Structures are given as C-alpha cells and as structure tokens.
Amino acid sequence: MRKRISAIIMTLFMVLVSCNSGGVAEDPKTVYLTSIANLGKGFLDVFVTFGDMVTGAFGIKADTKKSDIGKYFTDIEKTMTSVKKKLQDEVVKNGNYAKVKTVVAKFIEEVLDKIAAGAKEAAKGATGSDAIGNAVHNQDAVAADATSVNALVKGIGEIVEVVLKDGEGDAGATKTGDTEKKSIGKLFAKKDDDRAQEAEASAANASIGAVSGADILKAIAKSGEIADNNKNIEEAKDAASIAAAKQTDDKKEIKDEAAKKDAVIAAGIALRAMAKGGKFTAKQNEEKSANAVNGAAASAVGKTLSTLIIAIRNTVDSGLKTINEALATVKQEDKSVEATNTAEATTSGQQAKN
C-alpha cells in the first residue's frame, strides 16, 4: 500500500513541476494538485505511523506482567486516536473534498472509534504486577476477578466485531480428545493430587495449538457476562466462566459440553492469564510442572493477542486503501461547497481592500 501511495505522490509531484516551469503564476489547477499531493502525503504518514506500532516486537513470555497486557491495549487505543486525529487534520488542512471527507468520516466512525473503545475497555481488565504465567508449585489456583474478566470479554468482543468477518474463526472449534480436554481442569484444581502436571499442561498446549487465534478470539467474544467467581471448573460453560472458576476440592474436570471445546478452553486460559488475580496451579514440589503450565498460559495469550493485532492492522490498512482509492478519483470540481465558498469569500475580501 505504501508503494501505491508513494507512486501517486511522485506522479503528482512531476505534474506540479511541469505546471510550475517557466515561472508561470499558480492557477486553480496547480493549487488543486498541490492540495491533493499534500493530502496524499498526509495519509502516507498516517500509514507509516501505524505500521511502526504494529511491527514493533511484543514478545509474550510467561513472566510478562498482566499490567503489560493492559498497556498493550492502551497503546492500541492511543494509536487509533492518533490515526483519527491525523486523518481529520489532513482533510481540514488540504482541502475539503467531499468524496474523501465522507470516506474518512465513515472509516473513523465505523473502525477507528470502535477499536479504540474496545481497547480502552479491555485495558481495564488486565491489571496487576503478577505474571500471566504465575503458577507456582505449592500454591493454590486463584479465580480471576469477575469484573476484570467481563471487561476483557466486552472490550475484545467489540474489537472482534470490527476486525473479524463472520466466516473468520469458530468459537466452537475443537480437535483434541475428550479425555485430554477434561484433564485441563487440573490447572484450576485445589488438592495436590488434583493439580496439573506436565501431562495436563501438554493437553492444554494441545488445545491451544489445535485452533487458530481467530477461533480463540471468537470464543472470547461469544462468552457471556459472569456475575461472580464462585463457580468451580466443573460448572464452567464458556471461556469467561473457565477464567473465573474457583479452586474447589475434588473439582478437577471440564465437564460441560459447551466448555469442552479447544477454542473455548484456550480462550479461558488466555482470559485467566490476562485478568486481574487469575492464577493457575501445578503439582506440589514440581517446578517443571509449574513451568509447563506457565508456558501454556503464555502460549494462549500470545496467540490471542498476535492474531488480534494482525486483524486490526489488516482492517486499518484496508480502510486507508479505501481512502487512497477515493483520493485517486477526486477531481477539481469535486471540492466541497464549503471549501469553494471559503475561497470565494477570501478573494472577495482581498478585492474589497484593494
């Protein structure tokens, strides 16, 4: 896309040079071409700014803090707001062409504003200085804060609605066996005999690897709001209730058929890892089991967020391409009435002074 815009700018620049040769005074056509060239450059700058943000490395590791995830969402919100302001400024500075103005306004309202709002909401749910992979042998699992889980589900859901099409991702996607899926409940158990070992962590990784990031995002978006975190893992019915499942003696399996889906399990692990207070458990006196569980948590979060940012980037790229296409079709006579009237008023005022 950057090459396409650059080509347009270069072509316009060459036209401008030819129009200005010989010291001829600027005519309306030259002013028009200059305005369009400036507008095109402004949109290119917007694209570069956004590209710099999304190509930056964001390596999710087991020791990544929950607050780092919150900052990630806050940065998405700030970037959308920045792109919005730059687009608005370029339209105002370089000529109010109705075609471009309409496309920009639609893009801002239907894409940028909605992504920004979703990211702002999601950031409320990812707080705390503890790590996303925070299972420690000899320590119990802890249910994620219900309000935080709801904020993540709502915010991510709002973004998903904009950046993923109907056919992208399946909230019910599943491939692994029932026995393996049921055993993942041990990541949320209480008694030591019920706590996760490497086998259960491996099963969790299998569920995460069996589905796409889009599947996980759709499972998060499909989750209902939870009232509290007082239900155990065997009562969990969706990703949100898996994330908020409390640890209870002898409750160690994911049993509900709706929850026993790879996409839902992966989404629940990702939400619990990101949400305030959420913690997994591992076999007592087995550090290797804790490391395996934490690796699974990091994998779920990484897959979820990398897919989300790629989807956001593609959606914004598509919107900027639409603006670029509108820019390529505008003609001098397309300039909006308000811009024309402003120019005429300025000319009349100067003549009156003379």
Swiss-Prot record:
It holds the Pfam family Lipoprotein_2. Residues 1-18 form the signal peptide. The keyword Transit peptide does not apply. It is a lipid-anchor. A lipid is attached at C19 (S-diacylglycerol cysteine). GO terms for cellular component: cell outer membrane. A lipid is attached at C19 (N-palmitoyl cysteine). It is found in: Cell outer membrane. InterPro entries: Borrelia_lipo. The Vlp and Vsp proteins are antigenically distinct proteins, only one vlp or vsp gene is transcriptionally active at any one time. Switching between these genes is a mechanism of host immune response evasion. This is Variable large protein 15/16.
